[in-house]
Amino acid sequence: MSVKTAPQRRLRRRRRVRAKVQGTAERPRVSVFRSNRGITAQLIDDDSGHTVAAASWTEADTRSLPPMEQATRLGQMLAERAKAAGVDSVVFDRGGYRYHGRVRAFAEGLREGGLKV
């Protein structure tokens, strides 16, 4: 039987992508969550299971921005925090979302911030 609802399809894609994407201490995984209101992302070292840095749309300087600008700014903020933690390169885990729109803007913000994605 096929999976028909959009959230179920996203979860299947997420599991498939997650099986292939692994973060390490020197190259952590950037996990992205997209909701209707905003984006949340975190840098995860899968070897130790710890979050290195995080950024969320609920932070004061991004709350009032339009969605695409918000995603780009969050990418830049997370890149700054990653640099402060000594991270230069990351693995991008799109979380089952298509690489389009806000997810793409977030990834471009990471690159603008100086991270190698």
Regions found by a protein language model. Name each.
Residues 2-117:
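Ribosome large-subunit tunnel/peptidyl-transferase-proximal elements
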